[in-house]
A protein has these predicted regions:
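Positively charged n-region of N-terminal signal peptides that target proteins for export
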Residues: 1-4
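N-terminal signal peptide c-region/cleavage motif recognized by signal peptidases
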Residues: 13-15
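Electropositive
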Residues: 17-114
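Bulky hydrophobic/aromatic "packing anchor" residues in well-ordered structure
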Residues: 38, 109, 133, 206-207
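Structured segments of extracytoplasmic/periplasmic soluble domains
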Residues: 44, 67-75, 112-116, 129-132, ...
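Short, surface-exposed secondary-structure junctions/capping segments
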Residues: 48-60, 119-138
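Stable alpha-helical elements in mature extracytoplasmic
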Residues: 64-68, 101, 105, 110, ...
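Mature, structured domains enriched in cysteine- and short glycine motifs
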Residues: 116-124, 135, 139-242
């Protein structure tokens, strides 16, 4: 078992920063030189939007990240390293907690409604925490949202809509709101990404601000804070960046 301990401070703009730590979204952060994704849960992507209880769009991905940062504050965090991320080998899977607390960050995020359990890696864990958040409409559950995995796949037509604010019979209209191609850039996340439909499915291409194609991309499907984030979701760099 590998254990890392570090302090985490809240930052209000861009990725949350502290000495040796960067929080990129609601379930991923870097401790020293190791990037951890929290085991068994799935938080909104940093550029993901959700609908609130009134049906209005709000930046739930940024909010989930900021709530995690605020919860930790300046307290020390411990991460138990569970091995490499099967999706992106440069990241590690972690079960993390504030050093003096028994509740893990994984559990806290699901219980407070800022993440959902992620099967099959959850292996049945976090069901009680998710049920509690759903019944009490905490966090994401107050409105309507798509599972983060569906956003990553850009599963516009088949995305599962969940939350207390989802309206039966309005699924198509809701999906159009949630899968937007004009989403505003999250603070500190300037990398534009487009999805192109190919015979084998969608291909994701990202454009750095230094790329010749950057200004020509007017309507981005996705935004990323770093190249690592884009690569972790299967996007490739635009040819104009080479």
């Amino acid at each position: 078992m590998r254990v890392l301990i570090a302090g985490l401070l809240l930052a209000m703009v861009g990725p949350s920063l502290a000495a040796g730590i960067v929080v990129t979204d609601g379930d991923t952060f870097q401790l020293d030189h190791t990037t951890y994704r929290l085991d068994g849960i799935d938080a909104p992507e940093i550029d993901q939007t959700c609908l609130d209880q009134s049906g209005d769009v709000w930046p739930c991905g940024v909010t989930a990240r900021d709530r995690l940062s605020a919860y930790i504050g300046n307290r020390a965090v411990r991460c138990e390293d569970k091995g490499p991320d099967p999706v992106y080998k440069h990241r590690r899977i972690g079960i993390c907690s504030i050093e003096s607390e028994a509740t893990t960050l994984n559990e806290w995020l699901v219980r407070e409604g800022w993440a959902i359990k992620f099967e099959p890696s959850a292996k049945g864990r976090f069901a009680a925490e998710e049920a509690d958040a759903r019944v009490n409409r905490r966090g994401l559950w107050q409105g309507c949202f798509a599972e983060p995995r569906d956003l990553r796949r850009w599963n516009l037509n088949g995305a599962r809509l969940i939350g207390g604010g989802c309206q039966a019979g309005h699924e198509n209209r809701t999906r159009v709101k949630l899968f937007r191609v004009d989403t505003a850039m999250p603070p500190g996340c300037p990398i534009k990404a487009k999805l192109a439909l190919r015979a084998v499915g969608y291909e994701g291409i990202y454009h750095l601000p230094s790329c010749g194609s950057y200004r020509r991309v007017k309507r981005a499907n996705r935004w990323f804070c770093s190249e690592e984030d884009a690569l972790a979701e299967g996007f490739r760099k635009a040819l104009t960046c080479r």
